[in-house]
Design a protein with these regions (language model features):
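Extracellular interdomain linker/stem segments of modular secreted and single-pass surface proteins
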Residues: 109-117, 195-202, 285-297
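Bacterial Sec-dependent N-terminal signal peptides
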Residues: 1-45, 98-119, 184-192, 196
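Solvent-exposed loop segments of extracellular immunoglobulin-like
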Residues: 57-65, 143-150, 230-236
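Surface-exposed, flexible coil segments in extracellular/virion-facing regions
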Residues: 65-82, 150-167, 238-255
Length: 575
């Protein structure tokens, strides 16, 4: 009787579940993800790589199909892959259920040997942390299953895991060594961690420049762009050793030059907190009023001179196969190479990841006329925008060099959510063949991928002697999406950016214009120039232009977003 009752209850349960499904409950289609943001895997020739995707909403009836081209290479959830030939291989996984299907693509790089590669952003001089606070280390390591890890503090092993959380209750300096080992070799990264009381934490502030040139009557905005360990500091500002003219918690000071004489003025900012006092002197050269150094109009439409080119690390930095490529050893050599070739750089105008920039100028002052005044070529098309912010400058001191005040040309995203002023990223020199690690002034870290299919042995600018460098500007939010397996799109913004597919400022009426990614111009109005506080700059003309990659993002194995520019033109002469 109990057995009959038990069977009856089971049948009732099945019936109820069936009724629920019939009443409209639907299992969603499957989803696929992998154990890394960019699904690129590496394996040694002749070795087996097991790829275990994370698949949801599959039930018990999922069908798995792994394909290399048109050939099926697997029908299980996990893929065991090996190859006797080196190279990059693209594999597609399809998961199908009664509710639908999902598909993702990944890349497998087959290498003849592989020593573990470590990428980790380590500040110059190591880390500093408050006593009793945790410091988490999560290095990016490319490795195989037989790779082992060790963390040592002062030569004593403390962990055998890839990630490690440092925590010390005693002050002092600790030597940290992280090592990854496999049969092909080992790689290590070594640095120090200084554990301090609050009063001993080193205060740091970084200024983009300590010398400013500005036309008489204008307001110049002085501030550090990166502050560390301020601990509720106050900032006091003096002009020419006079009385304090501003004091409080803000590190931004707007100096109105209307009451100052033409010439050099010293501005002193003093930081005070409960532990230390620190001062910095900033030189402000008040120049003659706007228009004094205005240059006469010529018939030259295009920019005639390049002044400065400094890309961020990227897949196209140091490319040996670029037309006219030259191996530079100093920044001065790079600048000289573009001096008479402002069309772009020797790479065709690729500015690299966030912050990379180029500065060009004209043989005349470009007027702020009616409508658009400037045209800057980029190679954007629908679904492929890599926006750069445009800055403009007058030759305020009349020396013919772009060493005056930059004004941002306000675009459609200015001041909106995700837009950040004074956004700074520090890039760190890697070992050859490895990713470039970065650290930003918002507390984030990441890497610029080393793509075997695009780059030589390093993506860090070869000509820089320093082991790190910092780029600062304004940042736009990323609009990068994977719309289908292996197919990434970089969506455009409405208007106001270089290398951005905007029908409005490209003067187009076709959504599918420029499908081949040829160079085509975005157009800009000098009237959109704004001061640091967002107020109109009211420039009558400009002499110099800077374009800077404005997004910090990656599009899968296509790599980093990198603004690309071509010719710069005075559009007033084209109307």
């Amino acid at each position: 009787m109990k057995k009959v009752l038990h069977i009856f209850l089971i049948c009732c349960t099945i019936f109820i579940v069936s009724c629920n499904k019939d009443n409209g409950e639907k299992i969603p289609p499957p989803t696929i993800s992998f154990d890394r943001e960019t699904p690129i895997y590496t394996v040694k020739v002749g070795r087996t790589l097991v790829i275990s995707p994370m698949v949801e909403n599959t039930g018990n009836s999922a069908v798995y199909t792994w394909k290399r081209g048109d050939n099926i290479i697997g029908t299980e959830k996990n893929l065991s892959f090996s190859s006797e030939e080196e190279g990059s291989i693209y594999v597609r996984l399809n998961v199908t259920t009664p509710s639908g299907s999902a598909e993702k693509e990944l890349r497998i790089d087959v290498l003849p040997f592989f020593v573990p590669a470590i990428s980790m952003a380590v500040p110059d001089g190591g880390f500093t942390v408050l006593k009793g606070e945790e410091l988490s280390f999560e290095p990016e390591v490319e490795y195989f299953d037989n790779t082992s890890f060790t963390w040592q503090i002062n030569l004593q092993q403390v962990s055998g895991q890839k990630n490690y959380t440092f925590l010390k209750s005693e002050t002092g300096e600790y030597n940290i060594l992280f090592t990854a080992v496999n049969e092909d070799g080992e790689r290590s990264i070594e640095f120090t961690v200084k554990v301090c009381e609050e009063g001993d934490m080193p205060f740091e502030w970084m200024f983009e420049t300590l010398t400013h040139n500005v036309s008489s009557g204008r307001t110049i905005f002085l501030r550090p762009y990166w502050i560390k360990n301020a601990f509720n500091a106050t900032y006091s500002w003096k002009v020419n050793d006079g009385a304090v003219v501003q004091s409080g918690g803000t590190s931004l000071f707007g100096l109105n030059t209307a009451g100052l004489s033409i010439g050099e003025h010293k501005v002193t900012v003093t930081m005070n907190n409960s532990h230390i006092e620190r001062s910095q002197i900033i030189t402000v050269n008040v120049c003659a009023v706007e228009g004094t150094h205005r240059r006469a109009l010529t018939g030259t439409i295009e920019a005639t001179r390049g002044y400065f080119f400094l890309p961020a690390p990227s897949q196209y930095t140091n490319r040996d196969d670029a037309p006219g490529y030259t191996q530079f050893s100093t920044q001065e050599q790079v600048n000289e190479a573009i001096r008479n070739n402002p069309k772009s750089t020797e790479y065709g105008g690729s500015l690299g990841a966030y912050g990379g920039y180029i500065v060009v100028g004209f043989d005349h002052s470009v007027n702020n006329g009616e409508g658009y005044d400037l045209e800057i070529e980029g190679n954007a098309f629908k679904g492929s925008s890599e926006p750069g912010i445009v800055w403009v400058m007058q030759d305020e001191n009349g020396d013919g060099e772009p060493n005056d005040t930059w004004y941002e040309l306000k675009g459609s995203e200015y001041g909106k959510s995700g837009y950040i002023r004074d956004y700074a990223v520090t890039y760190f020199r890697p070992l050859l063949g490895q990713k470039v690690a970065w650290l930003d002034n918002q507390g984030n870290t990441g890497t610029i991928d080393f793509l075997h299919t695009h780059t030589p042995n390093t993506i860090y600018p070869r000509w820089l002697n320093s082991d790190s460098y910092t780029l600062v500007g304004s940042r736009l939010p990323a609009r990068t999406e994977e719309v289908s397996p292996g197919n990434w799109t970089n969506l455009d913004f409405d208007w106001g950016y270089a290398d951005n597919f905007s029908k409005k400022d490209m003067l187009l009426d076709d959504d599918n214009a420029n499908p081949e990614g040829n160079y085509i111009g975005n157009h800009f109005d000098i009237g959109d120039a704004v001061r640091y506080d967002g107020q109109p700059a009211n420039l009558s003309y400009i002499d110099f232009i800077k374009v800077q990659t404005a997004v910090n993002a990656k599009a899968g194995w296509f790599g980093d977003l990198s603004t690309e520019v071509g010719k710069f033109r005075d559009f007033n002469l084209m109307k």
